[in-house]
Design a protein with these regions (language model features):
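Tandem repeat scaffolds
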Residues: 1-230
């Protein structure tokens, strides 16, 4: 019977790996920051790239067959091989298909999620402050205690999502679909833009939702919505 031991002297923390060090299959760079790197022509087949920051990264000449990109972050400037679909890889970025994804307490500040599909996603406690969520589908998502301060939520489809205790302060909610959300208990809409046409509908919700105190923002949904009246 044999056992395998990790050589701690030769071990390199995955998050410190640089793209120029990539060699061989199953290269481990989990959590590494490769932002704005030109990776060049490299074999990244089977590579572990989950949680990597790939915003602005050029991977267009790489072999990404079987690479694990779950929760890696990309943006519109990320370049990829023509035959690779990052939208269905589990990575986070514009157009990503993340239905039912577990993103509880994730740090998604400033992330570009335009047009992403996050139906039924678990986003409770996630920090989406400053994120771009224009045209994103969040129907059935769990956004309880999520932070969306200053987020761009234009034409975002919230559907039947749960917004209890969510912090939307300063968010742009122009043409966002909020009429069918499950609950706004303790939700703070202070300083939001684009809610003028929905104020009456939101203020007609159950008093249990509207008057629930949010100890973090020190407000209620009712108070925050009424503050938006001209």
């Amino acid at each position: 019977m044999t056992s395998e031991f990790v050589d701690l002297q030769a071990w390199i923390a995955p998050e410190t790996q640089k793209p120029e060090e990539a060699q061989g299959p199953a290269f481990d760079a989990r959590g590494a920051n490769w932002r704005n790197h030109d990776v060049g022509q490299r074999d990244l087949s089977g590579a572990l790239l989950c949680r990597c920051d790939l915003r602005g990264t050029n991977l267009s000449e790489c072999n990404l067959d079987g690479a694990d990109l779950r929760l890696a972050i990309y943006d519109s400037a990320t370049r990829l091989p023509d035959d690779f679909s990052i939208e269905t890889s589990g990575a986070v970025g514009p157009g990503a298909k993340l239905n039912g994804a577990f993103l509880n307490n994730a740090d998604l500040r400033g992330i570009d999620l335009r047009g992403a599909i996050l139906m039924g996603a678990y986003l409770s406690g996630a920090d989406l402050s400053g994120a771009i969520l224009d045209g994103t589908s969040l129907a059935g998502a769990d956004l309880r205690h999520a932070k969306l301060r200053g987020a761009m939520c234009r034409q975002t489809r919230f559907g039947t999502s749960q917004l209890d205790m969510a912090d939307f302060r300063g968010a742009d909610l122009e043409n966002a679909a909020l009429e069918n959300v499950e609950s706004i208990k303790g939700t703070d809409f202070s300083l939001c833009q684009g809610l003028e046409q929905q104020l009456d509908t939101l203020l007609n919700r159950d008093a249990m939702e509207l008057d629930h105190w949010n100890p973090f923002t020190r407000s209620t949904a009712r108070k925050s919505l009424e503050s938006l009246r001209g």
